Amino acid sequence: MKNQIIKKIILYIISIFLILCLIGVYFNKEGFIGNDGETDGEKDGKKDNKPANNEDPAYRDRLFTDLKANIGEFDIIHNEQSEYQKIEVIQFKKNSLGYDKCLLLNNEPQLCNNDEKEYHEIIVHFPAYYISKLEKVLIIGGGDCMCLREIMKYPSIKQVDMLELDKSVISVSKKFFNTDAYENDPRVNIIIGDATKQILKLKENEYDFVIIDTTEDGAINLPIDEFDFYKTCKKMLKKNGVMIKNGDRTLNILSISKLFKNIEVIDLADIAVIGEYKFILGSDTIDFKKTALKNKELPKLKLKKYDYKNHKKHFLM
């Protein structure tokens, strides 16, 4: 009897050991999230500095094949290698979806001129809904200047600081998409350079709203998607401020949820070129699902895609 009990105990211990080994292998492969909000796997990836999948020629071939299949034939009307990335503009030939020009960075579609408002109106006006008086805004990225365009629709704006890594994105967007960088507007300050360094020169507790509108793939964006950078962005906000980040990667959601008392993931309608898209919203003082419209200027704006009356439809249930 005692021998049977001992055997069962030994088998139980061996089973526990094997389970722990399997868990260890899993987290070693997938990456374990530590106190800094990063996975070990992502840290190792940064050290390796391997190119992201979208920089692989095979990825480019698949992307172009999909674009032609889903939308139609196109020409590459602009192609340049800036100091940081490949910048391309493609122009579709006549198609049933009405697509014209699209901007690609390192083989990743960023926007198309016929549906970009679907993205830019949500990333700007959805959070602005919660800000009673929008005066000071910080934009991280946003080199196409389309977030800037939407922000400048608010008469209350006093200051917009935009941190953009690549000045070539601004010039290409101006040339092919007729965007405005507001160079002659004293309220707008565009700072070219590494956002992780430039942001340290700005005042803390200064902004009503922080927008992170950066590319989501490629080595140049790795420092932006770090917990410490999100932490710095939060320091820029006033007490009742709001931050929004494009994309919904699990790591980003976990990092931002560590920083803010309230977070929500909001949904964007499916767009043919970039597909289904989401944003992460964060605040310490605003319960996004329970708070009513605060911004009295928002209902007066002429918008094409975002309707404040249907605000709640964008929440993920």
Language-model features: locations:
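Intrinsically disordered, compositionally biased terminal peptides
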Residues: M1-N53, Y207
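Conserved S-adenosyl-L-methionine
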Residues: N262-I271
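The AdoMet/dcAdoMet-binding core of the Class I SAM-like
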Residues: P51-R62, S82, D100, D115-N246, ...
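Short strand-turn-strand beta-turns centered on an Asx-Gly dipeptide
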Residues: L105-N107
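Short, solvent-exposed loop/turn segments that connect beta-strands within catalytic domains
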Residues: K94-Y99
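Acidic/histidine-enriched, beta-strand-rich ligand/metal-binding domains
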Residues: S255-K258
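SAM/dcSAM-binding transferase cores
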Residues: D56, R60-D75, N79-Q91, Y277-M317
